[in-house]
A protein has these predicted regions:
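Short, low-complexity disordered leader/linker segments with a strong preference
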Residues: 1-55, 361-362
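N-terminal secretory/targeting leader peptides
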Residues: 20-21, 50-143, 158-362
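Functionally engaged cysteine thiol sites
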Residues: 1, 148, 229
């Protein structure tokens, strides 16, 4: 064999060994990378597992066709939209999940994840919050909703610690409706008036005779003469067709209203990711505005129907309003005394509400 031929063979053999070594190194590092990805896969579950859809239910006693139910359905869809489908809330209207008087307890026990109802359905359970239902001279549901949420932020009543309060809203102011004109206290004496909760105290203080019954029974009671009037907002004039069975309304300056809550089961709330909690709270702030304005729209529509049916709206004179306010003042004083006996800041709560209305109500 020629010398140069031997050298070529040795060089080729050496090159082959080097290539083999390179392949081994590449295979080694590929194996290392594969093991690393495998370990990362164990440490971090797949994205789809992390993004499992959170399903919640919402109990609401309003009928499905009621516009309150419609707006709450929009709330559900807005939450789903802003969370990119990570949260889906199904609404159960008409009290099908929990009756209105049991909604709060139903939420605390997990029967419902979220619930909407009135505080007045469970008188005595929310003593410090009941200040919102007192005859403070409300002029709109919107101002009531704004006050209710500011009040909650300031006082954080312990009676609501069992749940996550999403937001509060209120009905429009409650007026007096009767089958005959009521222009003064004398006209009201002895009249049987459908009323419940705070409204019963109002009717009694003004000299009427309160008769407890749900609003759904008011039409028959009025048409049959069981009662001669009701106390409530204008909205039922349309919603419950009460404009057909009353002839006059009396608008007085110390009107009260009913506050209602939208709350969530505390454990369900705490289990939500922080970013989802933030999104829901942002939507809630917007819905305070929407719900407050909606209640007033419904009240306006109810009054229009009332007038169209021949109803007459009586606005009390300044002097007569003062007489009514004087009759209703003991309700406020009794509330403060009752709260004091329970060790609650009723006086401070009442002052806050009164000052808020003086400052922001036009």
């Amino acid at each position: 064999m020629l010398p140069h031929a031997g050298l070529k063979m040795k060089a080729a053999s050496l090159e082959q060994k080097n290539h083999g070594g390179d392949r081994m190194k590449r295979m080694f590092w590929l194996l290392v990378v594969a093991v690393m990805f495998s370990l990362l896969g164990l440490a971090c579950p797949p994205i789809y597992a992390q993004e499992k859809v959170i399903t919640l239910n919402l109990s609401n006693f309003f009928p499905p066709e009621n516009r309150i139910s419609v707006v709450m359905d929009q709330w559900c869809k807005e939450v789903e939209k802003r969370t990119n489908g990570r949260v889906k809330v199904t609404q159960f209207p008409g009290g099908t999940l929990t009756p209105p008087a049991q909604t709060y307890v139903g939420v605390t026990k997990g029967v419902a994840d979220l619930g909407l109802s009135f505080f007045s359905y469970t008188i005595g359970r929310f003593p410090l919050t009941e200040v919102l239902d007192l005859p403070l001279g409300y002029k709109s549901g919107y101002i009531g909703a704004k006050l209710a949420n500011e009040y909650y932020k300031k006082f954080r009543p312990k009676e609501l610690d069992e749940v996550k309060v999403l937001f509060l809203t209120t009905s429009p102011p409650h007026m007096l409706f009767a089958k005959r004109p009521v222009k003064n206290l004398e006209d009201l004496q002895g009249l049987k008036i459908r009323s419940t909760g705070t409204s019963s105290k109002v009717v009694q203080a003004l000299g009427g005779a309160p008769v407890a019954m749900p609003m759904s029974d008011a039409y028959d009671a009025l048409s049959k003469g069981v009662v001669q009037g009701i106390i409530g907002p204008y909205e039922p004039m349309k919603g419950f067709k009460l404009a057909e069975v009353v002839s006059d309304s009396t608008e007085y300056g110390t009107a009260y209203l009913n506050a209602n809550y939208i709350v969530m089961n505390k454990k369900k709330w705490d289990a939500l990711p922080a970013d989802i909690q933030k999104i829901i709270e942002q939507v809630d702030e917007e819905w305070i505005e929407k719900m407050g304005k909606l209640w007033d729209e419904l009240d306006k529509e109810g009054k229009e129907v009332f007038i169209q049916k021949g109803g007459k709206a009586i606005v009390l004179s300044k002097e007569e309003n003062a007489r009514w306010a004087e009759r209703l003042r003991p309700i406020l004083d009794d509330y403060v005394k009752d709260m004091k006996s329970k060790g609650l800041p009723g006086d401070e709560a009442l002052k806050f509400c009164v000052n808020y209305l003086k400052t922001y109500q036009k």
